[in-house]
Every structure is written in C-alpha cells, then in structure tokens.
Amino acid sequence: MIEVLLVTICFTVFPYQGSSIILESGNVNDYEVVYPQKVPALPKGGVQNPQPETKYEDTMQYEFHVNGEPVVLHLERNKGLFSEDYTETHYAPDGREITTSPPVQDHCYYHGYIQNEADSSAAISACDGLKGHFKHRGETYFIEPLKLSNSESHAIYKDEHVEKEDEIPKICGVTQTTSESDEPIEKISQLTNTPEQDRYLQVKKYIELYVVVDNRMYRNYNSNRDAINERVYEMVNTLNVMYRPLNFFIALIGLEIWSNQDEINIEPEVAVTLRSFGEWRNTTLLPRKRNDNAQLLTGIDFNGATVGLAYVGTLCSPTQSVAVIQDHSKRTSMVASTMAHELGHNLGINHDSASCNCNAGPCIMSATISNQPFSKFSSCSVQEHQRYLLRVRPQCILNKPLSTDIVTPPVCGNYFVERGEECDCGSPQDCQSACCNATTCKPQHEAQCDSGECCEKCKFKKAGAECRAAKDDCDLPESCTGQSAKCPTDSFQRNGHPCQNNEGYCYNGKCPIMTNQCIALGGPGVNVSPDECFTLKQNVPECGFCRIENGRKIPCAEKDKMCGKLLCEKGNATCICFPTTHDPDYGMVEPGTKCGDGKVCINRQCVDVQTAY
C-alpha cells in the first residue's frame, strides 16, 4: 500500500461573529470567520514516503473550533466520484456535438467525518479554499471561502442562519405510488429474508449516473461551463454521502451541457418534460453513452411548488430510469437533496407516510423536499427499497468498476477494492466487517473472503451452493464453485426456449412479448392489437413497414407482418402505432418476439424457431 500524506489545517477563529453577509450560497445572517493555515504532518514514524505527482492529497485532516470547541475533520478523496470512462459533452454554436474525456481523477472532492463522533459526515470541495458542509453533534454546518482580497478567511455557519430564498415548501411531483407498495410497511417488516436474499442485499451496488444541464440553467450561470461543472461535481459528491448507508456508490459517468439549445422540449409541466427526457435518453443518449440512470437539471420553473419528478421503481429501464430536477437553490446541497429524492423513486421508494421517521432530522423521501444535505432514509424507505431490489433485481447496478480501471493510487479505507487490496470495508471507525482488516485491507487471520454471494462467515461457500436463483423463465440458477467468493457470471436459457406459458420464446435472457412492448411504449392499460390490425395497416406508410432503406419505408411481406411496426390498443383506440423518431428501431417489434406458433421475428422476418438460432 502507498503511504498517504496527512495534512493538518489549523483554523484561527476571528474574534467576532459576522452579522450578515452575501456569500456564493446566499445571504447569511450569522457566521463565524476562520483562517485556514495548512500545516504538513509527517506520517507515523517521521518518514515521508514519495508521493505521486498530484495536485490534491488523497487524505487530509482539518483542525478548527466550532462554537469554541476544537474538532478534527478527517477527509478522504472520493475516488469513486467519476467513472473510468467519464466524458463531458457540450455543443458548438453550429450545433456540433463536442465530447471530451478530461483528466478528472486528480480532483478535489472529499468525504469525511469528525473525529470521535460516530454519527458524523462531511462533503467538502477543496478546489479553491474549503467549501461544503459537515455534521457535528447532530447539527449541519457549512463552510465557504469569503473570497476577500489577500485573505484566506472562510465563513462557518448553520442552515438556520441562511436567508430562505422563498417561503414556499418545495415538493416532488410524484403523486401515485407503485402497486407493490400497497402492502403496509408493518407487514413488510415482518417478512424474513432467505440467506441468499440477505447476501444479495449486502453486495455493494453501483449506479453510473449521467447528468444533463439544460440551456436555461447554462445561461443562468453566464454560459460558464467550468462553473456548471463544479456545481454538478459538488452535487454528486453530496449525493454519494446520502446513498452510502444503502450500500450504493454513485459514479458520474458523463456530464452534458446543452450549450447551444435544448435537445428536447422543456416545459413547465414537469410530467411532459420527464417523458420527453426519457425518450431522449433511450433514442439518443444510450446508443452513444452507456449509463444506469440519467438526471436532467433545468433552469425552468416548474408549475406550482414542484421541483422534481421521477418514475417509481424503474432503475435500468431505457426510457424510465430518469428524473428531472429544477435547479431551485443557490446551495448545491439543497439541489443534491432533490436529486437524492428523485433517484430514490427510481429505486422503488415512495414518499414516506406520517408514521415514518428518521430518528432526528428530515427524511429524504418526505413529499416535501428537505433543505438538509445530511437527511436520511427512513426505516420505511429502507424496507421498501430492499423489497424492490429483491423483487426486480435490476442488473445494471451490479456492474462494479474493475480495480484496473481506477488510475489513482490505492487508498485503504475508501470502500473500493483496488490494486494490492483483497478487501476494503472503509475506515477503522466505519468498518462493519469481521472478515476484513480495515488497516491493511487484507482478510483477517484464516479468513478466505470478506464479501460476495459465495462468501459466508469469512469462508468460501461449498461448491454447488446456489448463489443466484433463476429470476424468470429465461434465466438459469448459478452455483458457487467453492474456490471464489464471487457468483459465476449470469447465464440464461437457450434462445428459443418457451417462456411465460408459451406466450413467447427466450431471446438473449429475456422473454420478448408484444403486450409488454406496448406497455413500455404507451404505459399501463395498453395491449397488443388484434392480428387483423397488422394486415389493415400494411397500406398505411407510417405503420405498415418492416424496414427503412434510403429513407423509404419498405412494406412487410404478408408472412412477416407481425415483425414490423408494433401495433397496440388502449380502450376504444385500436391499431395504434408509435411515430418513428430518428431511431429506426423505435416502435418496432423487438427481435426474438413470437410471431406465430413455433415462429419468431429475426431481422424483421417471421422464421421457424428451430432454424432461427
């Protein structure tokens, strides 16, 4: 392991408290002035090991006084903040898309905690002075540079001393709960998980987040891309702190700024904007940039007090693993709270009821958006989230970044297993593992493993023990090898295997059925049209074609009519097709879909299932 330089910063408190000041985060009515003084500290033993050429240290300590009491703030660089293939995209005045891969690994965004305080946390930017927030003795404090000429002065203040931008409570636009949440939480909490389910819940999960900034927000910050970047980095850094208790790690995989014009129609009606953004992600973003979830930050003022909206229980869905958030506050912590709330909906969590609580402070999933950066998930939210994970098991969250992809030096205690490490359970103060040595990031004596579906009581599970049950007709169960803590790669039924009571045939691990495809396009209550619609619509250019050649729609042969444009019905409306966007596959019957007894759609042709694969 590479020894890391520890840096101690001493804060000298200014002899008076300010009465009122305008800071970058807003008007502050009461604050303390402190002067950070950086004091290098040698590692234990007095020998300073060579360090890689970096601008910012991996680990730092800050010592200062809060209300006259000395505290030590430990900080560690959030090495999981950016994905290994992070990109930034903006647009030239002529509309050209410009995408770069900036070197962001030597960044200045940190997580931390107050020494000797169990329930403390921090999210700090050290890019230009110290900016962020930390929790001390149950209260949230903010720190921010005063930016006075020839001065290193900073302000420390509490949330209650920030002048509110308006008195109207901010709310989330989600009004309907998912059907799975109709069961009372009290009843859910009485259910007992199987050992396999408990192991799945304990596995670390990762969300690769793509953030889009619309044109109005871009102009609100004087068309300054650097200012936008820093703002988004701070938000995602805070988002990470809020999701750590759920065992989720959020990596920013891309940031896109619509610097020329908006790429979708953004309206004050939040549901319309959400739907448009979801379609854009599916048809435009995903083909060029993989991601697990996308959030749109907008400068528009949504109708009423609404500042965000998301689909519920849709993580990993191409069109619905999205959220839209109004950039409703100067303080990044407040917007980050809204981002956390809407992502919670994507993860299957509904609004908390009156019986839910978070011990102290506001709950993240309250229908009224919290202005506290360290609000927590209630026990109701945790149970609801776990129920969603066990029911749906979204696969995209299990894509763990490879240790070889992390290019910065390894740091023991940051929860990421990196080069030279066999486990990483966090700092010695935070480590909850009986199998991992938090100081060395090696297994404890005689331990074979720390975590994984095939790890039990620090030992590999026996060969043949099931580690991943079949989740549906097209999936196969996996068993441990006895030689590894990891469950073998997910495997599927052969293509052409009957599924869903012979309604379809398996194709690449899924059971494509027209009814489900109609629901994905048109929402609940939509069904596939009768067979005669597929014959009638062959004479309608927009709905009766199998492929497009040189801009011309080619009609389907009679035998292939069920493999072209998908036709759906809802209520009295029959034979509905969905207009083709610039994505030629949008609204088409998916490959592998059943088009007759013993027949499937392959390359827009209805062929015998025995010869198709």
UniProtKB/Swiss-Prot annotation:
Cofactor note: Binds 1 zinc ion per subunit.
Region annotated Hypervariable region that may play important roles toward cell migration, chain positions: 561-574
Residues bound to Ca(2+) 3: D475, L476, E478, D490
Cofactor dependence: Zn(2+)
Sequence motif: D/ECD-tripeptide, positions: 473-475
Disulfide cross-links: C316-C396, C356-C380, C358-C363, C412-C441, C423-C436, C425-C431, C435-C458, C449-C455, C454-C480, C467-C487, C474-C506, C499-C511, C518-C568, C533-C575, C543-C577, C546-C556, C563-C601, C595-C606
Propeptide: 21-191
Principal subcellular localization: secreted
GO cellular component: extracellular region; plasma membrane
Annotated binding of Ca(2+) 1, by residue: E208, D292, C396, N399
Compartments (UniProt record): Secreted
Keyword vocabulary terms for this entry: Calcium, Disulfide bond, Glycoprotein, Hemostasis impairing toxin, Hydrolase, Metal-binding, Metalloprotease, Protease, Secreted, Signal, Toxin, Zinc, Zymogen
InterPro entries: ADAM_Cys-rich, Disintegrin_CS, Disintegrin_dom, Disintegrin_dom_sf, MetalloPept_cat_dom_sf, Peptidase_M12B, Peptidase_M12B_N, Reprolysin_adamalysin
Highest taxon of the lineage: Eukaryota
Cross-referenced Pfam families: ADAM_CR (PF08516), Disintegrin (PF00200), Pep_M12B_propep (PF01562), Reprolysin (PF01421)
Domain Disintegrin, residue spans: 409-495
GO process annotations (BP): proteolysis
Domain Peptidase M12B: 205-401
Binding-site residues, Zn(2+): H341, H345, H351
Residue ranges the record marks as coiled coil: none
Glycosylation site list: N282, N437, N572
Family membership: Belongs to the venom metalloproteinase (M12B) family. P-III subfamily.
Protein name: Zinc metalloproteinase-disintegrin-like MTP4
